[in-house]
Amino acid sequence: MKTKIISLFFVLVLTLSACGSGFAFQRNLDKWEAQNIGHYQFTVAVSCFCPFANVEVTYEVLNGQVVNQSIQSSPDNPVDEAQVSDFYQSYNTIEKVFDYVGDAINKADETNIEYDPTYGFPTNITVDWIKLAVDDEMYLTLSNFEPLS
């Protein structure tokens, strides 16, 4: 009996934590969409066990389309800009970042998402797709957000 109660408790905690992630996601997506910001720029950095870890890319977005990008890498670690653009394509607009986060919340074993308190977009994203796997974690950081006129 005690084992069943403990098991039920853990199921309830996991269910509520998943709902909390989904609720925070929807609340912040609604906040972002209510801002109706059609022209903005931001910087994204991805950290993972991948070829372009720790490369920062700044995007200018106009009406959902990337109109400018700037790739920052160190001189001792040059990168192929076309490959970086392709790799970062899923994160090159705030809307795509929300798509990525929504997918991660629904499919990954573990997520931790922090949101900008003013605009609602995700700022720090940690995704562990398979908890027991090694080197599948993804970390995204969005910074330097600026609405443009």
Predicted feature descriptions by range:
Residues 98-133:
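Short, structured surface segments that line ligand/substrate-binding pockets
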Residues 20-22:
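Bacterial signal peptide processing site
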Residues 63-111:
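Mature extracytoplasmic domains of secretory-pathway proteins
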Residues 52-57, 135-140:
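Short, surface-exposed coil-to-beta transition loops
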Residues 35-46:
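A short, Trp-centered hydrophobic/proline-enriched beta-strand micro-motif
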Residues 1-8:
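Bacterial N-terminal signal peptides that target proteins for export
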Residues 15-18:
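C-terminal motif of bacterial Sec signal peptides marking the signal peptidase cleavage site
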Residues 33, 60-67, 117-118:
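A short, structured loop/turn motif at beta-sheet edges
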